[in-house]
Structure formats: structure tokens, C-alpha cells
């Protein structure tokens, strides 16, 4: 696995170490911070004349980024960088046929990384006296309603699971639909994570949470473990394994789900493991689970991330309109004075 910190200047390396050791962020999250800041400082080196403007962005080193360059950054520089990302940055750097302009979510993530870095320099490292980008506004992300399966479609999917690996696949789908797990959380599950009706889940940023298992989940796990025990020597820890007795991978789960969606008569291009997580969240909300409890179940750090699931379908909106007590009241209206005809 690549250790990007080798490329980082000391001041940036300290920031990355802080996030991993003090904030407890995962290596993946810290690596993303580095990659976003590397792109930013490559751009800044061009704009500040540290390298010739003709230099390819991806060939610029940031190992020489110093405090002088960091201090020289202004709010205007940040907005110019975000504009560059939206218009001129290749979506896929190594693909000659790629289109240009990053999605708003990618631009917002880079803005968040820059904001976090400068906040660290002021509040934690005490290297800067004031934050030059304190007033930075992030690109607005349009929150699209998540796609999800209806209750009937969920049952249809579960009922269609048969054939090879049926117990394993049924158990995986059941956990997605009932517990709202992320795919990375599911493939990382170990047998030792199961404690009666509780499941220990390692989520984003290496944060642990406990998910309680209902009867459907407990039965599915029991059936799968019985089959797993009979399959011969296997990874002693992994809950879900392949035919080769290795821990199942995210790609393996994606492939399996694609096959299972198709077999159930569902459009496999529209649904995925994450859509099953959306489904679990939606069904729980529709059946009385409050948003804060759902936040804990899903492992969301911020409540506003969970609130995207508070969408309601058109039938619910229609029922809400009908339930308004004024909806059936016939109001006797006073007659309006007739408008005099113009002469």
C-alpha cells in the first residue's frame, strides 16, 4: 500500500499524523486528505510562480512546500482553484479520453481538506496567527433523494435467492436490508464480532458501533454458519468467505448482488450494496424509527447526513394533505362585490 507521507513536506506530514493518531481517522481518510492537498499545492505553486506554467500538474512535487508559500494563499486563490477544478481538471488523469471538470462533491471535499489544514495550522500547530481562508464557502451539493427498494421489492429479492452460495448470499442481503451496513463494514466482519443479538461493526474512521440483530438476521447468520462449518478449512476469522475459503471482497459482493438483482427481476444497473443501505434506512424511518436512533444505527457522525433519508413518497404526502382537518371543511364564503362594468 502506498505511503503518501513520503512525498509530503514536514508541515503537511504533521497535519496527517494529527488526523490519524489524535482524531482517529482511518488511513484511507488521511490519504484522501493528502491527495486533495497535493493537488491544491501543485496548483498554488504554478499560480505563485514556483514552477513554470507549462509544467504538467501531475509532475509537480510538493516536498518543498514551505510556510512562506502556505502563508501567501488567499481566499481568492482558493476560489480560483475551485474554479479550475470545475472547468479544467481532468476527471481521470490517466485516461486520454476523459472529460474535464470535477463533480461538485469532489470540489467540496477538496475545499473541506484545505479548510481543515488551515484550521489545524492556526488552532493546533499555532504556526499561523490568523486563518486567511476562514470565510471560505464550500460548493453547494445538491442532495438527491437516495434510490431504495420498496418493502415488496426487498421481499422479492430475498425470496429469489437460491442455488450456489444461497445461505451466504441470503445472509449478506439480510444484513444489508436490516442493519444498513456499508459494504466495507460487511466484508470486514469477523465471526468474533457476533455476540448473541449484537454485532460489533468497525465503521468509518475506525469507529466501532454495536448493531442489534433482529430474528431474521440471527436466523440467517445461524444458517450460514452451519454451511460455513461444513465447507472445510477456511479463513478462521472472516464471517463471509468465497468458494476458495478466503474473505469475500467488496468486488465479490458487488458481483454477487448484480447477479441476485437480475435473478429477482430488478434492474441491476439501478441498485447496489449502498442502495440496500438506503433501503434499510428508509424502511426503518417509515416504520417509526426516529432520526437520531437511525444516525446511531448507520454510524453517521453528523445528523444532517442521516436526514437525507427523511424523504417521503407521494402517497405519504397525499395522506398528509388528506389528514389536515381543514381539508374536508366547506367554508361558507361571503359573496364578493361584483366589479362594475367599465363604461
Which role fits each region the language model picked out?
Residues 1-343:
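Conserved catalytic core of the tyrosine transesterase superfamily
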Amino acid at each position: 500500500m502506498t505511503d503518501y507521507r513520503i512525498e509530503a513536506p514536514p508541515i503537511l506530514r504533521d497535519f496527517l499524523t494529527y488526523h490519524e493518531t489524535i482524531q482517529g481517522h482511518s488511513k484511507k481518510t488521511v490519504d484522501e486528505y493528502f491527495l486533495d492537498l497535493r493537488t491544491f499545492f501543485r496548483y498554488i505553486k504554478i499560480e505563485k510562480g514556483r514552477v513554470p506554467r507549462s509544467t504538467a500538474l501531475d509532475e509537480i512535487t510538493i516536498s518543498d512546500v514551505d510556510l512562506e508559500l502556505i502563508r501567501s494563499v488567499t481566499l481568492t486563490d482558493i476560489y480560483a482553484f475551485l474554479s479550475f477544478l470545475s472547468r479544467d481538471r481532468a476527471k481521470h488523469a490517466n485516461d486520454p479520453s476523459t472529460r474535464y471538470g470535477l463533480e461538485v462533491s469532489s470540489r467540496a471535499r477538496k475545499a473541506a481538506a484545505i479548510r481543515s489544514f488551515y484550521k489545524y495550522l492556526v488552532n493546533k500547530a499555532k504556526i499561523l496567527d490568523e486563518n486567511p481562508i476562514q470565510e471560505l464557502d464550500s460548493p453547494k451539493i445538491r442532495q438527491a433523494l437516495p434510490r431504495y427498494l420498496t418493502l415488496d421489492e426487498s421481499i422479492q429479492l430475498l425470496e429469489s435467492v437460491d442455488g450456489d452460495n444461497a445461505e451466504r448470499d441470503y445472509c449478506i442481503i439480510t444484513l444489508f436490508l436490516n442493519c444498513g451496513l456499508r459494504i466495507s463494514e460487511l466484508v470486514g466482519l469477523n465471526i468474533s464480532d457476533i455476540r448473541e443479538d449484537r454485532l460489533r461493526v468497525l465503521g468509518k474512521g475506525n469507529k466501532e458501533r454495536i448493531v442489534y440483530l433482529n430474528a431474521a438476521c440471527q436466523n440467517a447468520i445461524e444458517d450460514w454458519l452451519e454451511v460455513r462449518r461444513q465447507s472445510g478449512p477456511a479463513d478462521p476469522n472472516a464471517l463471509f468467505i468465497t468458494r476458495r475459503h478466503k474473505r469475500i471482497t467488496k468486488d465479490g459482493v458487488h458481483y454477487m448482488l448484480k447477479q441476485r438483482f437480475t435473478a429477482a427481476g430488478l434492474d441491476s444497473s439501478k441498485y447496489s450494496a449502498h442502495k440496500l443501505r438506503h433501503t434499510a434506512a428508509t424502511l426503518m424511518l417509515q416504520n417509526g424509527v426516529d432520526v437520531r436512533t437511525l444516525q446511531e444505527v448507520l454510524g453517521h457522525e453528523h445528523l444532517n447526513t442521516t436526514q437525507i433519508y427523511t424523504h417521503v413518497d407521494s402517497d405519504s404526502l397525499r395522506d398528509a394533505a388528506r389528514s389536515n382537518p381543514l381539508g374536508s371543511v366547506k367554508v361558507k364564503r361571503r359573496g364578493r362585490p361584483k366589479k362594475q362594468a367599465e363604461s
